[in-house]
UniProtKB/Swiss-Prot annotation:
Site (Cleavage (non-hydrolytic)): K111, S112
Protein name according to UniProt: S-adenosylmethionine decarboxylase proenzyme
Gene Ontology cellular-component annotations: cytosol
Taxonomic source organism: Escherichia coli O45:K1 (strain S88 / ExPEC)
Family per similarity comment: Belongs to the prokaryotic AdoMetDC family. Type 2 subfamily.
GO MF annotation list: adenosylmethionine decarboxylase activity
Gene name of the record: speD
Length: 264
């Protein structure tokens, strides 16, 4: 696509949203509690801040403000306000804010921000544990959140990923013509590396005329040892391995397709 000569600021808002899932089987109550504690510590507010700060570097954004919070009994959230233009480091607020940001910041936050929320979860009887991370990278201007696609998926353990990308608003060129998108895209998959595409089965659901793009990803390879917490598959009987494999695979397919499925 030919580079546009714009009149004033690029007013297009580009939003990239992820839902990333990590699935685990923990046999006992103690193991389930241990998994939740492990994943909660692995993705605490400080670690998430590091990931999102690197994301800002990748997409070429400047950090204006960071708000982060760990929650009891589990979970964390981080929100980073970003700008396209360089800012004076002396004016950046890097202090922690456990509550809402000031109104002036919230108003700006709607335009360019990066945020993540985590949701560790377990079933009290079935042994299945799920960690979900919701990430949104929303930018206003020429910054493209798609640049951070590979990095974010690699940084978080991802068995299942759902991705949404949309472009909203319009910008004008020097002749006054409106442009509702400023780059070529027909699939989110085009912004993924070949090694990543080789790891996942993927399906697209796109609404091109509305500039809405959706991709679902499910890990191709299933190795039971990667889904067990503090239990080795070789310590289980054949029937136990088959039962746990069926339960995990059913859980993953239900999350991937977004609906409950009958037991096989």
């Amino acid at each position: 696509m030919k580079k546009l000569k714009l009149h004033g600021f690029n007013n297009l808002t580009k939003s990239l949203s992820f839902c990333i899932y990590d699935i685990c089987y923990a046999k006992t109550t103690e193991e389930r509690d241990g998994y939740i504690a492990y994943i909660d510590e692995l993705y605490n507010a400080n670690r998430l801040t590091e990931i999102l700060s690197e994301t800002c570097s990748i997409i070429g954004a400047n950090i204006l403000n960071i708000a982060r919070q760990d929650y009891e009994p589990q979970g964390a959230s981080v929100t980073i306000l970003v700008s396209e233009e360089p800012v004076d480091p002396k004016l950046i607020d890097k202090t922690e804010h456990p509550g809402p940001l000031p109104e002036t910041v919230v108003a700006h936050l709607d335009k360019s921000h990066i945020c993540v929320h985590t949701y560790p979860e377990s079933h009290p009887e079935g042994g299945l544990c799920t960690f979900r991370a919701d990430i949104e990278v929303s930018t206003c201007g020429v910054i493209s959140p798609l640049k951070a696609l590979n990095y974010l998926i690699h940084q978080l353990e991802s068995d299942i990923v759902t991705i949404d990308y949309r472009v909203r608003g319009f910008t004008r060129d020097i002749n006054g013509m409106k442009h509702f998108i400023d780059h070529e895209i027909n699939s989110i998959q085009n912004f993924m590396s070949e090694d990543m595409k080789a790891l996942y089965d993927m399906v697209d659901v796109n609404v091109y005329q509305e500039n809405i793009f959706h991709t679902k990803m499910l890990l191709k390879e299933f190795d039971l040892k990667h889904y067990m917490f503090h239990t080795k598959p070789e310590d289980l009987t054949d029937s136990e391995r088959q039962e746990i494999t069926a339960a995990l695979w059913k859980e993953m397919r239900e999350i991937y397709y977004g609906r409950n499925m009958p037991a096989v």
